[in-house]
């Protein structure tokens, strides 16, 4: 603790010393009573004395640097034991409160100064009393402690010397008199708990100017930076939105299509001639807008611009032929008209004469446009239908329609489609017909066609579609026995070459392409047919032994047969005979038909007693290959029936055999086949005659309605007809062909197909892919014929009503989409329906259901009465 001296230095802000009054001090501790109470320091109140309120205004607060240096010098002065006191005790008390809180001097409000004045008046009146003395002691002790702490604040006065100390002391005292007046009110503010608000107010006064000026300087710097050429504002100016002028230009372009207020005002400001002309042209607002876009002051130039755009709609009407142009027409007119009218106005702006005739032109054009539109809207119904018939419609997207501007495009496309269809039909006709009885491996080795891959029959199995096209190839044309090459006569050439020399066959195999593995074996078989009739060559007999035999399906149960059918991916039928036939057909399609046909032909010989009328029948019976080759050639030739049938007469199968055998034998004996073949030009026609006879024999398995009647009712006359045809056709060269021996056993097989299952299976084995289908098709066709052949009957009405009503037939019910009960329909077919068509077979309810579903007929089973209870 520093010792406090009793010396007093009186400092005041004014020369008046009478303002300071010292009351009598009580006896006591000199250290405590050395400082005065702030209430006794000022006799008059601040409100009463005007000088007290003015003192703070004369002396400004010292700067921050002076205040800081004064604080340091006071500490030095206290070390040198310099005695400095302040006569203004109010400042001491206020500074004491600041030191207690560790804060600096705070400003004092006027309310606090008034409280100080009241305390001074009370002290004057009650000075001699004892309780006041006790209060003074407390305040004295309080000021004594404050004096110790005020050494740091009073040290603001720097005293290096006596002369300098007095001058330096005056400045902080004058400045503190105003601050002390504010700080005396701080104690009152502490009582009211208003420290935060007063702190903010105090800081406004004593805060250095640098802190307050810095943000202002920063703002000035930012403004300067924006104004500088290298500032941030110049850099960001390049990123500013400068689209105001562009938007105005766009607005002008868009508003050229119609009048606006601004344009009307401009028209009012123009000459009287323009006003008169504008009254004449109210129907075209586009022209008015286009006239004003150029802003010509001349009266006639805008009218010229008005008259010319009326010529532009003509090409636009041509563009409206497509759907895209019609949809986009209202959106494209503004841009097209604005560009065209601006150029026209610029070109005609110099012309200032001929305003009236131009206005007349616009009138005429305005009159012509509705006349051009009237007939479109006033079409009569007949004319409208005619116009629709004449119009060519093409369905597609708008982009495709827009591209088809030329009128020849549709015609070209139609012609191209027709040409492509012709090419397709030609390509289908050129396909060879020899891949039907080939093995599975040979089919995979050949070139596949999309149509053949997708072709399936009614049972879900792949249909026998022609795969290889070897007709047009020069190497394979020698070997294919086909009906498509009528003009070249390749069939008899092939027979002659094969029968004459076997070496030519080997050469042909060497020359044949790799894509024809199917047709290499079949011509070899045909060559052996002719050679075996004349020569005996048992070279190809081991081939029959290498192939597996047909399994005996009749010895298996129904479950085994159904499982075998499912292995082929087919649905097993309910009938056992159909299961066996289907399995035989699938096995033949998988393993090939050559061996199977040979075995079936041998069985058919023993059962039906069919014989060959050849010179050596024993040899023919020993060798199965002649029959195999015959059936193979027949199967190849029959596929060309549909293309050449109307121009070809008919012959029997026996005459065909004799033709081929006798012709080949004669050629082989004479050893000159080529010149004789050249001399014989009608032989290809006879080969096609054979084709037709083979197909007629197959037609008996799939008969037409007239063929069924002829077979069951008028079969003997048909034989006579066939014999007559044969005699007419083979009258000159083949007199032996008049024997009608071959069709008779086949017709008998066709008649007894429903009665004898053994013969039916034999018949199906001869041509297995077609037999089962054709039996089913026969029944389906018989059902359709029976339904259509049912006569309309009249049913008697009830006795109450009068007259009769017609009972609808099954055909009428089907046409009216009435639900057909399968039980009733099958019973009618088995009792009456099939008898109308002379059909002896009966139909199961499952087959009738399949027939109805295939025809798209609404069918259902009859609901039993027992089911209604549940």
Curated annotation (Swiss-Prot):
Lyase in keyword set: no
Feature: compositional bias, Basic residues: 309-319
Compositionally biased region (Basic and acidic residues): 73-89, 137-149, 665-682
Residue stretches of biased makeup (Polar residues): 57-68, 104-120, 151-168, 605-615, 630-645
Keywords of this entry: DNA damage, DNA recombination, DNA repair, Nucleus, Phosphoprotein
Family that this chain belongs to: Belongs to the SLX4 family.
Name of the protein: Structure-specific endonuclease subunit slx4
Source organism of the structure: Emericella nidulans (strain FGSC A4 / ATCC 38163 / CBS 112.46 / NRRL 194 / M139) (Aspergillus nidulans)
């Amino acid at each position: 603790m520093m010792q406090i001296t009793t010396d007093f230095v009186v400092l005041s802000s004014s020369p008046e010393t009478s303002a300071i009054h010292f009351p009598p001090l009580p006896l006591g501790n000199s250290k405590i009573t050395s400082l005065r109470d702030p209430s006794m320091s000022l006799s008059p109140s601040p409100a009463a004395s005007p000088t007290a309120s003015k003192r703070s205004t004369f002396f400004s607060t010292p700067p921050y640097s002076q205040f800081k240096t004064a604080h340091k010098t006071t500490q030095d002065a206290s070390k040198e034991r310099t005695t400095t006191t302040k006569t203004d005790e109010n400042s001491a008390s206020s500074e004491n409160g600041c030191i207690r809180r560790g804060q600096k001097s705070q400003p004092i409000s006027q309310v606090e100064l008034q409280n100080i004045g009241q305390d001074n008046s009370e002290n004057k009146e009650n000075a001699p009393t004892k309780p006041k003395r006790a209060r003074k002691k407390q305040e004295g002790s309080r000021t004594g402690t404050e004096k110790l702490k005020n050494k740091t604040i009073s040290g603001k006065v720097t005293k290096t010397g006596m002369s300098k100390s007095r001058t330096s002391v005056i400045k902080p005292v004058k400045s503190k008199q105003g601050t002390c007046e504010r700080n005396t009110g701080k104690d009152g503010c502490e009582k009211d708990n208003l420290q935060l608000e007063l702190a903010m107010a105090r800081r406004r006064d004593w805060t250095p100017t640098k802190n307050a000026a810095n943000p202002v300087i920063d703002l000035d710097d930012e403004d300067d930076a924006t104004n500088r050429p290298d500032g941030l504002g110049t850099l960001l100016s390049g990123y500013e939105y400068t689209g105001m002028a562009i938007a105005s230009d766009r607005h002008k372009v868009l508003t050229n299509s119609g009048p606006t207020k601004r344009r009307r005002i401009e028209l009012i400001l123009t000459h009287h001639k323009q006003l008169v002309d504008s009254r004449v042209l109210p129907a075209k607002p586009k022209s008015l807008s286009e006239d004003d876009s150029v802003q010509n002051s001349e009266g006639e130039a805008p009218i010229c611009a008005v008259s010319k755009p009326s010529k532009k709609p003509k090409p636009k009407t041509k563009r409206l032929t497509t759907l895209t142009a019609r949809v986009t027409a209202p959106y494209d007119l503004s841009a097209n008209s604005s560009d065209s009218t601006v150029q026209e106005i610029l070109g005609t702006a110099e012309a200032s004469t001929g305003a009236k005739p131009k206005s007349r032109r616009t009138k005429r054009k305005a009159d012509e446009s509705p006349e051009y539109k009237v007939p479109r809207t006033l079409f009569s119904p007949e004319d409208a239908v005619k116009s629709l018939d004449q119009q060519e419609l093409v369905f597609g997207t708008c982009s495709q329609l827009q591209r088809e501007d030329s009128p020849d495009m549709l015609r070209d496309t139609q012609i191209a489609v027709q040409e492509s269809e012709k090419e397709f039909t030609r390509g289908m006709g050129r396909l060879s017909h020899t891949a039907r009885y080939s093995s599975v491996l040979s089919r995979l080795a050949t070139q596949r066609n999309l149509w053949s891959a997708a072709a399936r029959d009614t049972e879900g199995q792949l249909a026998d579609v022609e795969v290889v096209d070897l007709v047009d190839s020069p190497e394979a044309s020698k070997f294919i026995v086909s009906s498509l090459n009528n003009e070249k006569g390749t069939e008899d050439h092939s027979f002659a070459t094969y029968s004459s020399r076997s070496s030519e066959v080997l050469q042909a195999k060497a020359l044949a392409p790799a894509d024809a593995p199917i047709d290499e074996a079949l011509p070899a078989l045909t060559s052996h047919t002719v050679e075996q009739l004349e020569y005996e060559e048992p070279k190809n007999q081991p081939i029959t032994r290498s192939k597996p035999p047909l399994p005996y399906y009749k010895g298996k149960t129904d479950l085994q047969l159904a499982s075998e059918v499912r292995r082929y991916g087919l649905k097993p039928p309910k009938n056992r005979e159909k299961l066996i036939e289907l399995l035989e057909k699938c096995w033949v399609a998988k393993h090939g038909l050559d061996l199977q046909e040979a075995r079936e032909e041998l069985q058919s010989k023993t059962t039906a007693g069919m014989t060959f009328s050849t010179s050596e029948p024993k040899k023919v019976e020993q060798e199965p290959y002649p029959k195999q080759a015959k059936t193979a050639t027949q199967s190849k030739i029959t596929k060309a029936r549909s293309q050449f049938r109307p121009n070809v007469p008919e012959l029997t199968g026996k005459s065909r055999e004799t033709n081929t055998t006798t012709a080949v034998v004669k050629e082989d004996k004479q050893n000159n086949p080529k010149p004789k073949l050249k001399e014989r030009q009608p032989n290809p026609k006879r080969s096609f005659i054979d084709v037709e006879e083979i197909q007629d024999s197959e037609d008996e398995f799939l008969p037409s309605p007239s063929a069924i009647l002829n077979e069951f009712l008028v079969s003997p006359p048909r034989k006579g007809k066939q014999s007559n045809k044969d005699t007419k056709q083979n009258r000159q060269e083949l007199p032996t062909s008049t024997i009608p021996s071959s069709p008779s056993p086949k017709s008998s097989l066709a008649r007894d197909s429903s009665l004898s299952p053994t013969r039916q299976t034999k018949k199906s084995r001869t041509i297995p892919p077609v037999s089962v289908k054709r039996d089913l098709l026969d029944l389906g066709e018989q059902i359709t014929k029976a339904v259509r052949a049912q006569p309309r009957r009249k049913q008697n009405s009830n006795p109450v009503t009068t007259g009769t009503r017609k009972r609808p037939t099954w055909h009428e019910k089907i046409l009216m989409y009435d639900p057909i009960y399968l039980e009733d329909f099958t019973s009618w077919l088995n009792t009456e329906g099939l008898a109308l068509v002379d059909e002896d077979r009966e139909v199961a309810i499952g087959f009738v259901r399949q027939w109805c579903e295939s025809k798209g007929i609404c069918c259902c089973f009859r609901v039993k009465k027992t089911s209604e209870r549940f």
